[in-house]
Amino acid sequence: MISSGISVIVCCYNSAARLPETLKHLAMQLVPGNISWEVIIVDNASTDSTSEIAENEWQKYDQPSEKLRIVNEKEPGLSYARQKGAQEASYKYLIFCDDDNWLNSSYISNAFIIMENDPKIGALGGKSTATTDDNQFPEWFESKQNGFAVGSQSPVQGDVSQTCGLWGAGMVTRTELYLKSFNKMYPSILVGRKGEILSSGEDTEFCYRLLLMGYRLFYDETLTFVHFISKERWSPDYIERSIKSCETGVFDSMELNKYSLLNKLVYTKKTLKPILIVKTFLGYLSTLAGRTSWSFAESKIIFYYYSQIDLGVDKNTKDIFSFYKENRQ
């Protein structure tokens, strides 16, 4: 049985230059003696000295050497790296700390207490500020900072299940839930992120799967971290890669809409379901006859959810529905 405590998962791809400051902040965590914790570096097919730097940096601080573990994941991709980290975790809670996230010294202890106090929290997020190695941020950065996992994730604290998802940066979750959410039977339906590919909707997909399982998303500003953003992030090369990633982003957005629709249906009042079944089927027939602009794909999904009658829904929709039926608490 997995032990009580927190495993901090740091997924790395060529992170040698970014790791020292990140590990410094992890080594400086103020964690009470009754809370067990560890740091797991997942070297995700790096071609630099990521693993060596991690080991050497950790030795600089007054922390037991066994508190840091380095594991390798040869399959490139953030989802593979996170899965490897979760599989290796010794403790029941996970913190996904990006290689450029500098966690506040109370992050681990606060995260543990919040998760322990509410068993229905599936994922927990915090607030970040940004720093850079450039002289200053570009003029446009403040208006776009949320896309860089910077700032507040919500105008209100507490349950944000129906208002927003959570960033993967600094996200806290339960090890069991992460392993249950993504596995061989139910892998991600998204294209995913590999190496230098920038587009990724895995964080949002994970949040949707938690909601389908009956868990909640929480936001708490006692969890704070600094997000280091290199000036390379606004270089022409990086911007070009961002533009190229938009094709993947469009696909991901279409697939995530299926999760969004199913979650809405799950929380629809039972008294409205018969009405929606009839309305949806009539809308479907009208669509076939070319008499309405009713969303053809959406009508099939809604009818499938309520009646289990397949009018031609795609495989991903069926997989999402199967995941919901098997894992709903």
Predicted region positions:
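Conserved donor NDP-sugar-binding/catalytic core segment of glycosyltransferases
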Residues: S106-W140
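Short, flexible, basic/aromatic active-site loop/helix in glycosyltransferases
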Residues: S143-T163
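Catalytic core of nucleotide-sugar-dependent glycosyltransferases
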Residues: L198, Y215, T222, S235-Y267, ...
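Glycine-rich, basic loop-to-helix element that forms the pyrophosphate-binding segment
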Residues: E73-A89
